[in-house]
Amino acid sequence: MDLNSASTVVLQVLTQATSQDTAVLKPAEEQLKQWETQPGFYSVLLNIFTNHTLDINVRWLAVLYFKHGIDRYWRRVAPHALSEEEKTTLRAGLITNFNEPINQIATQIAVLIAKVARLDCPRQWPELIPTLIESVKVQDDLRQHRALLTFYHVTKTLASKRLAADRKLFYDLASGIYNFACSLWNHHTDTFLQEVSSGNEAAILSSLERTLLSLKVLRKLTVNGFVEPHKNMEVMGFLHGIFERLKQFLECSRSIGTDNVCRDRLEKTIILFTKVLLDFLDQHPFSFTPLIQRSLEFSVSYVFTEVGEGVTFERFIVQCMNLIKMIVKNYAYKPSKNFEDSSPETLEAHKIKMAFFTYPTLTEICRRLVSHYFLLTEEELTMWEEDPEGFTVEETGGDSWKYSLRPCTEVLFIDIFHEYNQTLTPVLLEMMQTLQGPTNVEDMNALLIKDAVYNAVGLAAYELFDSVDFDQWFKNQLLPELQVIHNRYKPLRRRVIWLIGQWISVKFKSDLRPMLYEAICNLLQDQDLVVRIETATTLKLTVDDFEFRTDQFLPYLETMFTLLFQLLQQVTECDTKMHVLHVLSCVIERVNMQIRPYVGCLVQYLPLLWKQSEEHNMLRCAILTTLIHLVQGLGADSKNLYPFLLPVIQLSTDVSQPPHVYLLEDGLELWLVTLENSPCITPELLRIFQNMSPLLELSSENLRTCFKIINGYIFLSSTEFLQTYAVGLCQSFCELLKEITTEGQVQVLKVVENALKVNPILGPQMFQPILPYVFKGIIEGERYPVVMSTYLGVMGRVLLQNTSFFSSLLNEMAHKFNQEMDQLLGNMIEMWVDRMDNITQPERRKLSALALLSLLPSDNSVIQDKFCGIINISVEGLHDVMTEDPETGTYKDCMLMSHLEEPKVTEDEEPPTEQDKRKKMLALKDPVHTVSLQQFIYEKLKAQQEMLGEQGFQSLMETVDTEIVTQLQEFLQGF
């Protein structure tokens, strides 16, 4: 590409690519895509985005194309890689001038320089760091800032490399430039502190921006640049200096008010200081040991004393609390139970912690957390009134403790209470003691204090197990509080029902459950929505609990289910609907079939909710989960849901529909339970199997469920299903077997085995293309035992239950192997006998014995030659299945199922599904469960004797080991 002529053309196309008109935009994008691999294209882009007279949008696009080009074509091994000559020119051009006037473009240029640095620095680009260091010293404000911005992005990128050689290079870089980085940061920080007193906002903002960038560089160097940072005086000097700098910056917040343009940058800088400490503690806990005392003193004074008044802000308090939490909970600082087994570093850190966390300090922290930070704020109470659903969602967990004040204070309380429970338990018990009896509804402060203390008692439930008689407290104090219906008492009604939910799995006598259910029924009718939602949560925890008893719950089931359904209709937010649906699902799951009389309203409502939730895939997932439990609870009656259920399954499992990304896993589970509980096949249920072929092509983690679904169809209606879908299914299986794991192969073959078991005549015909693959695997002695076992299971079914098909298969394989049929059969029997030990399932072992015995009687010399092996397998099978009757002393086949008896289902067991019943009926037709192996052997040997005559038969029996013959005779006594 000639630069001069090309620049004009590329500039024109880039201009077209910024157009809003797709007719202009699309051809331009196509042209740029073609140029991506042209030599010289990136040099042209560099010329364009460094030309400040051109349109900003065009320059922005040029930078983006350059950045993408680095990702795709900068590496030497990449297809269409840039030449070394062009890369040298580009590297030089990128760091010639740091004078980009537009902030967004400057950031993108800094990022792309960092991307090149990741690949080329320092080996191919040794001049980058020295150039940056010189450039950040210049007096020109713009150049200095842009160089500093680039310096930060380069440092950040190099710090993120993880290979050992790259880490070593970064360590070398860090030790070489750390002093300079420190002095640079100190210079900009001092400048900023001087500017603050001047009141010049522009100058303050400019110097603060440089302070922030230089601190970002130092953070990466400090945290990632040293193996043993505590041995480096500059590093430890910088870290110790942070506390003084933090005080200075916090004091600045008095003069830089919340409405000042610099306020946001100031708070970001203060937070960045705390991030340096948190990151360093996380990466180098033992190097942090000299900083433990100072960190705790600093954080506790600003968060729990008047020192912080007027200067702290929420995010800073959260960071300080996280610092305390990380020191308290740090496993590196916890000695072993046997102190002698702990390292000196651990003991040193532990000693510092213990010296700091004295009884007065812990007591004050605990009291301040509860009486100050746990109190519901004005903002929260306003939100409760104006947006009750938003208020309940605000309280969600996850990682919110890292960023939000309330979750952060609660997690800190839990960790400190756990670590120092012997000290803090009496403190909390004393706070509880002072709050006995009802609270005056007119005294809002007293109500909020009680709410905060109850919150603490709930959070510390496990630690207070031995110290609180919760059952008595529930009866005498908590239950009466739930009955106070005054509107101003609602924070306590909500808190008490939440508190019970926290204790339910810790300590709550089973006999008290009915009293709790009564209270829940009342609270689900509370006037306040927040109270109702919290009550639903506690109901879920109660129903989920290990000691839940259905018989205690059933008297309240109708009322609770009706009230939960009303709550589901009343709430409007997606998250709240999901939450209430999960509670409903949980109830349905626990009571199972007992739910049937009460689900009519929910069944009518779910289609409407499904339609309304078209844009909310997570809510649809919750609906799918509810449907799964509904189908399981309804059993065969779930057939009445098909007009709604089957289209839902169809959409959720259709990989051509975008929602499948969210819905597929739950959709497959719903499909499976629908099949398992279906009393009979319907055309619509059969039709949705069209979704299966693309699912099998995905080869995802959902394959196992897909195989279960296919089995479900085979058990439900094998003939109709196989005639409709077996050809396509067989093709999918053949493709899968080429590329799937060993475990996956076994799953595929188990489906085939099931088809042969359910339909011995049609099955082998439909899966005919797979059977040569199985036969070949047996003959060649498949090395994985679990695969070989499955091969023999499949072949055993064909040999035993479809002899004519086996003969045609043997004939086909003889042609393929270019062998005589008899010779091939002999090889197969020999391999079967040799690998019998691969089969571990008793059913398959009996099947093998029956299958090989089915070859008798025979005058075929090959079969007679293998007679000894067949008898060996048969006797092994007898050992597997025969049990001795202690009364008569005779043997009987324990696998025989003579009649269909419905097993009694205990309360804890799930009733049998329709599929379970189908499997039972199938077993009653399966030779493995209907043919006595003992009888079968006797009849086959008798027939062989009649065919050969006494003398010929005796000669045959003499080929069998005498010990085996003795065992056989013992099993056949009485015949």
From Swiss-Prot:
GO terms for molecular function: nuclear import signal receptor activity; small GTPase binding. Residues 28-100 form the Importin N-terminal domain. GO terms for biological process: protein import into nucleus; ribosomal protein import into nucleus. Keywords: Acetylation, Cytoplasm, Nucleus, Phosphoprotein, Protein transport, Repeat, Transport. InterPro entries: ARM-like (IPR011989), ARM-type_fold (IPR016024), Importin-beta_N (IPR001494). The modification Phosphoserine is found at S343. The keyword Cytoplasm applies. Its main location: cytoplasm. It comes from the Eukaryota. HEAT repeats lie at residues 123-160, 209-248, 318-356, 422-459, 473-509, 511-548, 555-593, 600-636, 640-677, 683-720, 743-764, 765-804, 819-849, 850-887, 957-974. The modification N-acetylmethionine is found at M1. One of its GO terms (cellular component) is cytosol. It is found in: Cytoplasm; Nucleus. The keyword Isomerase does not apply. SMART domains: IBN_N. Belongs to the importin beta family. Functions in nuclear protein import as nuclear transport receptor. Serves as receptor for nuclear localization signals (NLS) in cargo substrates. Is thought to mediate docking of the importin/substrate complex to the nuclear pore complex (NPC) through binding to nucleoporin and the complex is subsequently translocated through the pore by an energy requiring, Ran-dependent mechanism. At the nucleoplasmic side of the NPC, Ran binds to the importin, the importin/substrate complex dissociates and importin is re-exported from the nucleus to the cytoplasm where GTP hydrolysis releases Ran. Interacts with UBE2E3 and RPL12. This is Importin-11. It comes from Homo sapiens (Human).
